[in-house]
Amino acid sequence: MVDKLLIGRKLAQIDTYLKQIGDFSRISLNQYKMNWKTQRIVERTLHILIEACVDIANHIISDQEMRLPTGYADTFKVLMENKVIGKNLCETLEKMARFRNVVVHQYETIDHTIVVSILHRNLRDFQKYKKAIIKYLSSQEDRR
């Protein structure tokens, strides 16, 4: 059975992180490049936002006995295959997972343009993910 309390905590964390990073959502590329503290705050917050999404996905995948993902990006593909999230959101989250891998393993090569683009265009995708997870959990309750 899906642990709704665990998922609820993770969804609340996503809200908290989105509020925190929202202060940077209108930053210019030049402002971002010039401030290493902002870079670290944004990179780390994006990292833990993505981790929270992956944690939720892995919990659902395990509980529902879906196929095991081959990596972080594939986690979202498994959710799409099982109709938890749609194709467009899946593709966006796969890119986010690959970005997460760069932040964690190749941090010296982070492209500031990509980070600022995420800030400007993709923060709302985390909200879409939250809504999809809540909808999925609700549909699972309706089946009982």
Predicted regions and their residues:
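Solvent-exposed interaction patches of small proteins and small membrane subunits
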Residues: 1-144
